[in-house]
């Protein structure tokens, strides 16, 4: 699911309203610009390796940008959990110099702008095939 954007700037937000996946699949929201990702929010139920424990990360929200062909350093929001099958919201609001990352109406993180927010062209919501995630709405708010 995606929405093309004519303009996007400070004070605007992009939010997905959906049913939380019940089988551990990932889902993400990406705000695209010309030739890169302004912000990519990726929820992972079970992912990679945590160097502190040697086990996979669990219930983590990964924030990142991709200015050109290379991803930047990741920012993690640990212990990020949605109850499977529940109706939830995940989004961001562009503030002066950073995004406020908001889940179910609560700010869970901030993420510094790495690309100009006025370069945004598209907002995408996607999930791993077969996850049982139903998108209810993709909201772009002034």
Swiss-Prot record:
Keywords: Antibiotic, Antimicrobial, Hemagglutinin, Lectin. Homotetramer. Galactose-binding lectin. Displays antibacterial and hemagglutinin activity. Inhibits the growth of L.infantum promastigotes by damaging their membrane integrity and inducing cell apoptosis via the production of reactive oxygen species (ROS). Inhibition of L.infantum promastigotes appears to increase with time (MIC=1.2 uM/ml after 24 hours, MIC=0.9 uM/ml after 48 hours and MIC=0.6 uM/ml after 72 hours). Agglutinates Gram-negative and Gram-positive bacteria including E.coli, S.aureus and S.epidermidis, and inhibits biofilm formation by S.aureus and S.epidermidis. One of its GO terms (biological process) is defense response to Gram-negative bacterium. Gene3D superfamilies: 2.60.120.200. InterPro entries: ConA-like_dom_sf, Galectin_CRD. May have potential use in the development of new treatments against pathogens that cause Leishmaniasis. It comes from the Eukaryota. Cytotoxic activity against L.infantum promastigotes is completely inhibited by D-galactose. Inhibition activity against biofilm formation by S.aureus and S.epidermidis is inhibited by alpha-lactose. Hemagglutination activity is inhibited by alpha-lactose (MIC=100 mM), beta-lactose (MIC=100 mM), lactulose (MIC=100 mM), bovine submaxillary mucin (BSM) (MIC=32 ug/ml), fetuin (MIC=16 ug/ml), porcine stomach mucin (PSM) type 2 (MIC=8 ug/ml) and PSM type 3 (MIC=8 ug/ml). Thermostable at high temperatures. Pfam families: Gal-bind_lectin. This is Galactose-binding lectin.
């Amino acid at each position: 699911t995606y929405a093309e954007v004519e303009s996007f700037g400070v004070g605007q937000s992009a939010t997905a309203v959906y049913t939380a996946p019940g089988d551990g699949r990932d889902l993400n929201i990406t705000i695209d610009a010309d030739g890169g990702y302004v912000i990519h929010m990726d929820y992972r139920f079970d992912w990679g390796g945590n160097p502190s424990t040697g086990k996979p990360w669990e219930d983590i929200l990964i924030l990142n940008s991709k200015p050109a062909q290379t991803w930047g350093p990741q920012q993690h929001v640990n212990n990020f959990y949605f109850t499977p099958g529940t109706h939830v919201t995940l989004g961001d609001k562009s503030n002066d110099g950073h995004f406020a990352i908001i889940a179910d109406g609560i700010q869970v993180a901030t993420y510094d702008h790495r690309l100009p927010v006025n370069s945004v062209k598209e907002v995408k919501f996607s999930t791993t095939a077969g996850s049982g995630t139903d998108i209810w709405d993709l909201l772009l708010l002034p």
